[in-house]
């Protein structure tokens, strides 16, 4: 039986070495946070809490993701602890060592908005657009539109709360799931009304429907009407997408992802002000 990890305060690590930007007014356009491990237990509607997104301990004491009540098959045991340690030389040890945990390895400023502002001051950053981290992992394994929408609503409520008292320096971007375009459009309106300043989606749908398909027009139209930016963020993806739809990770970095959606599907021509 997996044991759910709960938050016991925030990480207490010291601020890490930072690179200070010489020029004033810079904005971090890809400012990821690490979600508190009990975020979905706290913010998910009651009817879904038995299938909450969780970080649990396996029988060997290693952390793992639990998605929709099932063990993650794409995130290896011990993987959660590595999420805050990108580029670390001892990444393999982090993943194999039960004493090195998601909370223990979380960098200063990754879960606490006041700490994040302190890091930004040290870096001379004016603002940061906030994106999810754990949220980039679950959608590839959850082919349940209703629960997917519930997961995004929970995260969006939390991230707006995270950013709320930052004097507009922390800019929340809402996570949308195109598993149900009408529900996603409704959530975008709710999230923006609550304080979100933009939105993003995964680069795939479980139905294999292209993101630029007319059935998703309601989401693009809503973003355009609200005057908020719409982003497509790389995520974990189902195995069927590998090497078939967009090619390699290099292709994503070369913006073929955006080009294929906006050009071939005509989104750029139909929703003109969305690209202003």
Give the residues covered by each predicted segment.
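Helix-coil boundary/capping segments in enzymes
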Residues: 1-276
């Amino acid at each position: 039986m997996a044991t759910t990890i709960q938050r016991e305060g925030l990480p207490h690590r010291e601020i890490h070495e930072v690179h200070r930007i010489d020029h004033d007014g810079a904005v971090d356009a890809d400012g990821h946070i690490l979600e508190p491990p009990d975020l979905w237990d706290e913010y998910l509607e009651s009817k879904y809490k038995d299938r909450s997104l969780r970080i649990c301990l396996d029988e060997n004491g290693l952390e793992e993701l639990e998605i929709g009540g099932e063990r993650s098959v794409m995130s290896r045991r011990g993987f959660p602890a590595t999420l805050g340690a990108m580029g670390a030389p001892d990444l393999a040890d982090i993943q194999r060592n039960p004493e090195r945990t998601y909370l223990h390895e979380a960098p200063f400023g990754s879960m606490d908005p006041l700490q994040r502002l302190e890091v930004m001051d040290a870096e001379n950053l004016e603002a940061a657009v906030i994106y999810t981290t754990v949220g980039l992992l679950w959608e590839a394994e959850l082919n349940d539109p209703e629960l997917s929408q519930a997961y995004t609503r929970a995260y969006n409520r939390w991230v707006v709360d995270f950013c709320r008292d930052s004097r507009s320096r922390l800019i929340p971007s809402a996570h949308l799931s195109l598993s149900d375009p009408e529900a996603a459009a409704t959530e975008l309106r709710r999230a923006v009304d609550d304080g979100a300043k933009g939105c993003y989606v995964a680069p795939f749908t479980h139905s294999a429907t292209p993101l630029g398909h007319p059935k998703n027009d309601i989401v693009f139209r809503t973003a355009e009407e609200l005057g908020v930016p719409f982003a497509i963020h790389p995520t974990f993806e189902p195995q069927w997408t590998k090497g078939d739809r967009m090619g390699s990770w290099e292709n994503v970095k070369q913006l073929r992802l955006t080009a294929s959606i906006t050009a071939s599907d005509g989104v750029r021509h139909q929703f003109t002000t969305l690209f202003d």
